A protein has these predicted regions:
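A short, sequence-level motif marking secondary-structure junctions
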Residues: 7-8, 287-289
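ATP-dependent carboxylate/phosphate-activation module, predominantly the ATP-grasp catalytic core
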Residues: 1-37, 74-89
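Conserved metal-phosphate-binding beta-hairpin within the catalytic cores
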Residues: 1-2, 47-75
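Catalytic cores of soluble metabolic enzymes centered on carboxylation/carboxyl-transfer
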Residues: 38, 75, 79-288
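Terminal amphipathic helices with adjacent charged low-complexity linkers/tails
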Residues: 6, 10, 61-67, 71, ...
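Beta-strand scaffold of nucleotide-dependent catalytic cores
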Residues: 1-12, 64-71, 79, 130-131, ...
């Protein structure tokens, strides 16, 4: 059986950023044909298990599609399929591996609502999506109706260069695409990851784009929009808050040495030099706490 399609045209460096289900680009007739083509592909190689068949769809002739590859596993974006089908794909995969039959037939598969996933990357979009590394200082993940977050983030985690820069997935589901987009926008605004650069602000710019909102998307849109995006620059106030945060963390170490500036007769000021790039005052300054 097949569980519908996913739209994955929004990509950077040929890697997906935003995925959604169902696709806004397919007609019902094309949707049925592409689903059957996926089933036929699996049957042709006697494949048993959960898998993902990927197709390229013509931008000029959206009723035409071409086989690209088959991945014999679940994909990163499988949560959007779970959200609109109500099927736990991991559970089904394990059942199949254990020799059990599928728990449902094709006629029992129903697609309800719309679900969109945003991949949170440790990277700097305005620097050509260069990866970002560092130690996570604080994490706050969004909650609310229709919001699901798949991540392993925690305070103190070290983000290095050994693995893919994806650090979390934010999935928003609604009764329709507009509601799913609105919920995703709010969830991205609520997500906080301190200590590294992320693409959170970029993702918000992307899903607010008029063509994205209208469903006019293709694999070239990400590169076309990036040069015109304006990102918030850190201000002196942000740097001051960061210094306060570092100071509060330093006052609770695991050893006996406290950087509290203790002197006979009272504590001395603790000074931090903050270097930061900012549009309003690109400089460095000292702050005493």
């Amino acid at each position: 059986i097949h569980l519908g399609e996913r739209e994955c045209s929004l990509q950077r460096r040929h890697q997906k950023i935003i995925e959604e289900a169902p696709s806004v680009l397919l007609s019902d007739e094309t949707r049925a044909r592409i689903g059957q083509a996926a089933v036929d592909t699996a049957k042709s190689v006697d494949y048993v298990g959960a898998g993902t068949v990927e197709f390229l769809v013509s931008d000029e002739e959206p009723d035409k599609f071409y086989f690209m590859e088959m991945n014999t596993r679940l994909q990163v974006e499988h949560p959007v399929t779970e959200q609109i089908t109500g099927i736990d794909l991991v559970e089904e995969q394990i059942r199949i591996a254990a020799g059990e039959p599928l728990s449902l037939s094709q006629d029992e598969v129903a697609l309800t609502g719309h679900s969109i996933e945003a991949r949170v990357y440790a990277e700097t979009p305005q620097a050509g999506f260069m990866p970002s590394t560092g130690t996570i200082l604080h994490v706050s993940e969004p909650t609310g109706p229709g919001i699901r977050v798949d991540s392993g983030l925690r305070t103190g985690a070290v983000i290095g260069t050994e693995f893919d820069p994806m650090i979390a997935k934010i999935i928003a589901t609604g009764t329709d695409r507009d509601q799913a987009l609105a919920r995703l926008d709010q969830a991205l605004a609520e997500m906080v990851v301190l200590g590294i650069n992320t693409n959170l602000e970029y993702l918000q710019h992307l899903i607010r784009d008029a063509d994205v909102a209208a469903g006019n998307i293709d694999t070239t849109l990400v590169e076309a929009r990036l040069p015109d995006m304006v990102f918030d620059a850190p201000t002196r106030r942000h740097a001051q808050i960061a210094a306060h945060f570092v100071h509060s963390q330093a006052r609770a170490p695991s050893d006996a040495w406290l950087p509290d500036g203790f002197r006979l007769g009272g504590a001395a000021e603790v000074k931090y030099r903050v270097n930061y790039p900012a549009d309003d005052d690109p400089s460095s300054f000292e702050i005493a706490l």
